[in-house]
Curated annotation (Swiss-Prot):
This is NADH dehydrogenase [ubiquinone] 1 alpha subcomplex assembly factor 4. Keywords: Calmodulin-binding, Lipoprotein, Membrane, Mitochondrion, Myristate, Phosphoprotein. It comes from Bos taurus. The gene is NDUFAF4. A lipid is attached at G2 (N-myristoyl glycine). It is found in: Mitochondrion; Membrane.
Amino acid sequence: MGAAVARAVRNFNLENRAEREISRMKPSPAPRHPSTKNLLLEQMSSHPEIKGEIDRKDDKLLSLLKDVYVDSQDPVSSLQVKDATARQKPKEFRLPKDHQFDMMDVKNIPKGKISIVEALTLLNNHKLYPDTWTAKKIAEEYHLEQQDVNSLLKYFVTFEVKIFPPEGKKAIESK
């Protein structure tokens, strides 16, 4: 009910208000900068016919303007475009290596990516056997780029727990 009242108030005397707005005097142009004002006055005094050309309405241009027809359509919303692109999946997949940790139900992994379990495994293998698990071999094995593997090996390390016995106390030996 409130929408009907609001619509009636909004549309009340709409045509008269529109006509009044159209017939209202247009705002005057902004004042010119003093440095250009002298140049304009000089040009107007040397060429008085320009003043008449500026104020004259061109009937030919007005008739062409009346023939202009504009047909517009709403653009496709960006949400629809994003939805269409989000549905596409990468075409190449590979199966995950070693299913010893089935914490997550990963069916396939896009080429060029690895799972967390695989990342920890390859970091541990490289740490334990750096001669056999080189960056080149890891890149071939997991279908990764060489530069990404080098960065992974350089900046990421596996979690280690080291327990140091307190100084001054001897560690309790196990029986």
